[in-house]
């Protein structure tokens, strides 16, 4: 049995039109700005090195009123324009029939996710839905992926995503699990009190590999590699953001599948992007 985790935008749902309209309506109504092209909007949202608010509106951060306006636009346009990709519902039913634990891990606000999935008719197929909020940081932070794995009875996990942020979250999550396994874990110690070394706002450069080709991930006070010994900083990577025991993650593994039916752009770190048929074959058992 497996845990299968899905990103939402660009993986489950084609929401590119909804996002385009929301951004451009906000530009027009609040700032009197001309519309942006959809491709530019989508690329910016998927780029972990971009400040989307600065790129879209010329400001480094939003006021509460500005955020409220955008979120109202976002929810309304999702309802009207976001649709499941062709073949996704059949894939989800097949996974469910095979007994897999299904989850969503999305950077969309957590309070909007269930309504969006209900609207498309697939909410009932998911065992767990996780979105970003004050306690759960957005990808490329791996916290929501680790949270799903800790809650699932199946510790072999596959994450399907379409963007650089998804890929980096999976890379960081796999690194965390590998280092936890090397160190032997710390049974009974809550991840929520395991340390405060995570740099949740870390930005990634264009090349996230070391000189020897090994994937590297930087945390406050430590830079670890897939070939390096485990460190306390690595073990504390996602500690502050979810309630689980280290024992719940012992022996877990995380694989990433880059998909191509969405609107993201495969990065140079990923394998070739996959079709739904190819994803089904790799997931197996369905």
Residue positions per predicted region:
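Asp-based, Mg2+/Mn2+-dependent phosphohydrolase catalytic module
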Residues: 1-2, 110, 114-286
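N-terminal helical cap/lid subdomain that shapes the substrate entry/recognition surface
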Residues: 2-89
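Conserved functional loop/turn residues at catalytic and ligand-binding sites
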Residues: 9-12, 48, 99, 121, ...
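Conserved SAM-binding loop
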Residues: 12, 102-105, 159
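Short helix-capping segments at alpha-helix termini
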Residues: 29-34, 59-62, 98, 121-125, ...
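Pocket-edge positions in alpha/beta enzyme catalytic cores
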Residues: 33, 41-45, 76, 80-83, ...
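Short, acidic loop-to-helix structural element flanking the phosphoryl-transfer center
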Residues: 76-104, 110, 114, 142
